[in-house]
Amino acid sequence: MEWNELSKKEKQSFSEADMCRISITPSIHSAYWASLTHLREHYYFTDGNIEVNGNKTKRGKAKKADYVLFHKPNIPLAIVEAKDNTHSIGDGMQQALDYAEILDVPFAYSSNGDAFIEHDRTGKGDIIEKEISLDKFPTPEILWDRYKTHKGYNEEQENIVTYDYYDDGSGRSPRYYQVNAINRTIDAIAKLSLIHI
């Protein structure tokens, strides 16, 4: 039986993890977000704040997005937050927007398995938030084109910003705030290249 054939009561009996497995993940995969370079599930991007209480320290709760969609490993495009079906479609939006702000991501999505709500943080479109059916989730190409339009990149600038980061072979990758700083620097260089040509 397909997700859309289930009754509301049946849908609400599933946990968030089940609903992701049955509905949200297949919808994202069907939009060609299948490769590990484009899609990361349960994406931890902080270790949690260090909390000091007298002589004892412990870590607070780590921040974890349900899904982060990437153009390339260090160019995040979208956050998708899932809630179980007892919630409305948009109930995860505030969390998605908070994470999108932290990760400097232009697109935020929320879903309860019935559809998606998209929030466009670019300010370029006429509609900031809209509902998208499960079978109409945007492809990597569509979101990348919207991102390039938002940034105003020409082909040369796109080549600059998509150039791979240096890899020293250690297996370590930059933290989210380092990725943000690197990407902002590369973006500024790409925009300056247009002036000096």
What are these regions (language model features)?
Residues 1-195:
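ATP-dependent helicase/translocase motor core
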